[in-house]
Amino acid sequence: MINEMTAVLPLLMSDDADALLKDEIINNRLLKINTETTRKRAIAEFQRRYKAVPPAFWKHYLDMSLQAQNIAMFFVVLKAYRICFDFQVNVVIKKWNSVSQSVTFNDVYMQMMEIAADDPFVDSWSDATKRKVVGSYLTILRKVGILNDSDALHPVSLPDADFAFYLTIGEPWFLEASLLQPYEIERIKDSAL
């Protein structure tokens, strides 16, 4: 949904965002989503993602390359959805630092079940919903290039200057979440000074 989020971004950034978004839900000028109910749900998710980061982030986002925008949207997802952040830290980074360097549906699903054991809200989800969340997360990893079709992990590929942006906004953890090696992170930090 990166294209849809980018399409409504000017509405979200506007001083009159609420009225413009309500109009979009009704008139479907930008999203081209068939049903009003689905548009309403999509707009609610876009608002959640928009609010997960400072407004200045979005101004910079509009000037990024398409590749950098894809990675930026991954960052936003990790900020907006705690469960995705937990999957990244507790499954993906751990697997990246292990011998196997691969992640399967079952690896993430096991983490989902551990989260559900401690979180009544997640525990209340149906098994189908839990599986859908895991599947969506894995799809995101594939779209940003962290996971390939054979479930092997790969670091995010971006120029150092694009990664340095996350340092300037006080989010250095994202470099590790992007599976960069410590020496790469140090090089980016040094170049950002």
What positions do the PLM features span?
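A short secondary-structure junction motif
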Residues: 91, 115-119, 144
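Eukaryotic partner-binding/assembly regions in large regulatory complexes
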Residues: 1-72
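Short, positively charged loop/turn segments that connect secondary-structure elements
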Residues: 33-36, 113-133
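Leucine-rich, amphipathic alpha-helical/linker segments
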Residues: 2-16, 77-78, 82, 172-193
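Accessory, usually C-terminal, subdomains that scaffold auxiliary metal cofactors
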Residues: 127-132, 136-193
